[in-house]
Amino acid sequence: MKELIAMSQVRDIMQKKVITIELQKTVQNAAVILKEKHISFLVVVKDSKPVGVISERDIVRKVVAENVDPKSTQLEVIMSKNFKWVEPNASIESAVQKMLNNNIRRLVVLEDKKLAGVITQTDLTEFLRSKILINATVENRE
């Protein structure tokens, strides 16, 4: 099983459809998208290039808890500009390690500096769960 995981790449499990928001939008705009799409994270783009990320946690900590007006606050003020990312050909193991080392729940996937996808803890958990189940099934047949 370890070999299967070692051979797998981020591109094998990343989400290719990433919901984004333009940099000039407000925190209110972001909150509406998060609610409507039932997601907790957006990639912030400028001219179709990722420039940051914003999460529900950012909104709670930097806007709600600080009593800041979400309707007039630009995303640039609260987004994380130094977001962590991986390339599609990165190993699953290296993606997990990057998440653990940086205490984060998701990674943006960039290919040639362009947004290619996103990978989350949930994606990784489902991938590992499926590998464990397959491995257990194979072992039970032997």
PLM ranges: what are they?
Residues M1-E142:
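Tandem CBS (Cystathionine beta-synthase) repeat/Bateman regulatory domains
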